[in-house]
Structure formats: C-alpha cells, structure tokens
Amino acid sequence: MFGDRQRPMVLVLGLGESGLAIARWCARHGCRLRIADTREAPPNLAALQAEGIDAEFVGGAFTPALLDGGIEIVGLSPGLSPLEPALAALVAAANERGVAVWGELEFFAQALRALGTSGYQPKVLAITGTNGKTTTTSLTGLLCQRSGKKVAVAGNISPAMLDRLASAIDETALPDVWVLELSSFQLETARTFAPDAAAILNITQDHLDWHGSFDAYAQAKGLIFGATTTRVLNRDDAAVMKFAPAAGAADAPRTVTFGLNEPTQDGDYGLSRDNGIAWLVEAVDRDAPDEATTTRRRKRDAAHTPDIAQKRLMPADALRIRGLHNAANALAAFALARAIDLPAAPLLHALREYRGEAHRVEVIATIDDVDYVDDSKGTNVGATVAALDGLAQKIVLIAGGDGKGQDFGPLVAPVARWCRAVMLIGRDAPVIRDTLAETGVPLAGHATLEAAVHAAAELAEPGDAVLLSPACASLDMFRNYAHRAEVFRAAVDAIAIDKGATP
C-alpha cells in the first residue's frame, strides 16, 4: 500500500478532507501517525479523535522538526501551497532526508497498484481543468454507470478518494471504473498516477497565488497523464493543446480532441451545424472497416489519407444542460467513456438524461420571459467567459467578489458582445469596472447581491437572462459560493412574489 515500505511512520500535514482521509487510510494499515496543522484545533480534529485514530497531533507553525522521530512519508493536504515559506522549508528538508512527499492522489495510486497484485484491475478515468470539472466528472460517471459498469466517483468532487476506496473494500464492492475529479492542487504531488484516460477541459488563470505562475499551474494540470494514458484534449484551448504529443513522435500516447468546431482527425469529436441545428459529431474515416470506429483503431499505413466524414451522434439541443461550454463537457465525457471501449448507444442515452449540477449555469427561474441563471460556482474569469458565450443571449451580468489577482481582460469581448448591463459587487468591483469601461456596456455598483439582482431584473428585457457568474471567489461577502447562490435564489424568489409569478 505504501510502495516498498511496510507500515511506515507518516506525517500528515493539514487536517482538511484529504488530510483526514490520508490519516484514516494510514491508520487502517497500521501506520504510526503524526498529524500537524497550522490551526491549534482544526474542525476535523474532533472527528479524528471520535474515530479512535491513534495519532500524535501538533498544532502550530510547520517546521522541519516535524520530520524527526523516523518519519518515512509526508502526506500533504491539497489546500497547502508549496510556495508558503514554512511548508517549502519542511518539504525541502524532507527531500534532503529522502522522505517521500505524497498527496492523497499518490496514496490512492499506490493503493491501486498494491490491490492489482491480487487481481483488481479497474479502469481509471480522470478529469481536470479550470472549469467544468464537476459537471464532466458527474456526467462521465453517469455514462459509465448506464453502460452497466459499477462506478465510483471521487476526488475533488467528494468523497475523498481514499475514503471511497476504503468503503468499497469494506463492502466488498470494488468498482469496475473509477472516475476522478482532480484539481491542480491534488495533481501537484502526483508521482505514479497513470489513469487509462484523462481529460484536460481548459486552462485559464486561476489559483496563481497558490502555484506562483500560470506556467506552473498549467504544468500541474499536465501531471494527470501517465506515459500510456489516452489524452482527451480541448483543441479550442492553446494551453491544453501543448500537452498533445508531437506529430510522429515515437511511442506517443493516443490522443483524442474535442471542440466546438467540426473535427478533422479520425476519432475526434466536435460540433457540426446544418440547417440551424448543432450536432454532436465524431470524425470517422469513410475507408476504415467498422471495427476501426472504436477507440482501439488499427494502425494505418503511413501513406493512408483518411476520407473524413462527420458521424452525427445527437443534436446539441437534446442535452438538458445549457450552453456551448456544456456541449464541450458532454463531448469530453463521451470521449473518456469511449476511450475504455464502452458502447456508444447507452452513452448517448445517458447524455440526454443528465440534468447538470447545482450552481453551474443552472436556470433557477423564468419570470416574465427572463431567465435567472445561477452560476455562483463561476469563481474565475474563464468560467464567466464560458457562461456568457455558452448562453449566447442578451444578458444582465452580476459579477464581482474576491478576484484573487486575476486579469479581468478576457471578459471584455464577451461582455461587449452579450451583456445589456453589468451589475458589480464585492471587493474587486472597482477593478472589474475599470477593465470593462472600454466595452461601452452600462456598469453599476451595488453594496449587496440582493440590490444587484433587483436592479438587474429592472433592466432585463423578455428573452434576456440575469446571470450570476461572479468571476470571483465569494469569501469577501459570503460563507462560500453555495451561500452566495442561496442569497441569489432568495432575491429571485422575492422578485417572483412581487410580480405574482411562480419561480
């Protein structure tokens, strides 16, 4: 379970969800435990004690002295930035001493490897990206389930991977397929993780305070791929396509792309438009035998030039999730499921079935022919750009909060194209206002979200959408993004009551 180590002594840094899962897993396998947190009494300490886990707890600043006493593995929680000086010093000391530094994902990878010696060989699918991870992960899980597979969905989406694995072992119900949502934080400490197929949905500015630079952030995303992992890449995103193998590279892993245009390479996915209808399509070689339309395509002669046709899969409007960005998410999920040779028919039925996730471009009400859309999970600029372009209608946008040092410049073009007005809230409202001034779109600041919603309702015209997609974190005004969504919904409910409508 721990490489070549038998019941090692483990130092767990940070007692969040992943840290607690690491502690549980290590205790389950007889490891000696030391747990450290910068907080003297982190919330999960009570859970640790209630479960009877025998561990030494140390609260306070991290120091290299935490490694003393025979520590063999450091288990690092994903919320801890490696750039924080005290943590960086501790990790450097661990490296000098030859102490392994793993995150939960590496513990999980090592556990699957150990279980493999007993014959357990599941398929593993993984998803990362700045935006769309949860939707695509949930959808991929549903697709695999509707194909008759026993599926476990875990990771950044919750539950923690190790907790889900432990429960599957206890219930003697190990899944056929693991579908993992993985953040850049979780991937940062990946060492031997090698899923069967993995997707990078997009890479835009986010978490730069944690990674230090955009390049470091993108590099962490790329750690989702093992040497033989099928790569599912968004061809519309230049940062993502940097992970495509060089043309003609020897022993290059299989690569499948998806995008919002017509695919031109055999086996890729995209959108094709005909008579005003957008279709989800797969590019297929007309000259290929039928069996070559599966993901295990036979190698072609180098001189063969494919005659590409667009094989229609389903109309994009048949998806219950709205927006072009969700069509892209659906294509990514379909590509992942096909990468492990699941049959297409049940996958297409499942695509029509999926209703989406809360707070992700979720239409919560239509009042006087105006849609009210909750995208409170849109905590970065890329998410808001995707929501604006995806809805593709006139919009009164509500944005603002803690911008986390982002560049708001990418909002200019979609705001100019789609927005009737922008209502601004939160700490970085002035920064967003300055950035959007060149659009010529009316901009108004509001002290509360409730005030912004009511003002947006007054400006919206029939056929418009009032969209909460803040492009910012929520903690300057709310407990979290879900609380922000609750306030938005309550304000919309109040508008419905005022207008005598049913939200």
Curated annotation (Swiss-Prot):
Q: Where in the cell? A: Cytoplasm
Q: In which pathway does it act?
A: Cell wall biogenesis; peptidoglycan biosynthesis
Q: What does this protein do?
A: Cell wall formation. Catalyzes the addition of glutamate to the nucleotide precursor UDP-N-acetylmuramoyl-L-alanine (UMA).
Its source organism is Burkholderia orbicola (strain MC0-3)
Q: Reaction(s) catalyzed by this protein?
A: UDP-N-acetyl-alpha-D-muramoyl-L-alanine + D-glutamate + ATP = UDP-N-acetyl-alpha-D-muramoyl-L-alanyl-D-glutamate + ADP + phosphate + H(+)
Q: What is its EC number?
A: 6.3.2.9
Q: Does the keyword Cell wall biogenesis/degradation feature in the UniProt annotation?
A: yes
UniProt entry keywords in alphabetical sequence: ATP-binding, Cell cycle, Cell division, Cell shape, Cell wall biogenesis/degradation, Cytoplasm, Ligase, Nucleotide-binding, Peptidoglycan synthesis
Q: Which residues are ATP-binding?
A: 129-135
Q: Mind listing the GO biological process terms from this record?
A: cell division; cell wall organization; peptidoglycan biosynthetic process; regulation of cell shape
Single GO molecular-function term? UDP-N-acetylmuramoylalanine-D-glutamate ligase activity
Question: Which family does the record claim for this protein?
Answer: Belongs to the MurCDEF family.
What HAMAP family does the annotation carry?
MurD
Where is the major localization of this protein?
cytoplasm
Protein's name in the database? UDP-N-acetylmuramoylalanine--D-glutamate ligase
Top-level taxon in the UniProt lineage: Bacteria
Identify one Gene Ontology CC term for this UniProt entry.
cytoplasm
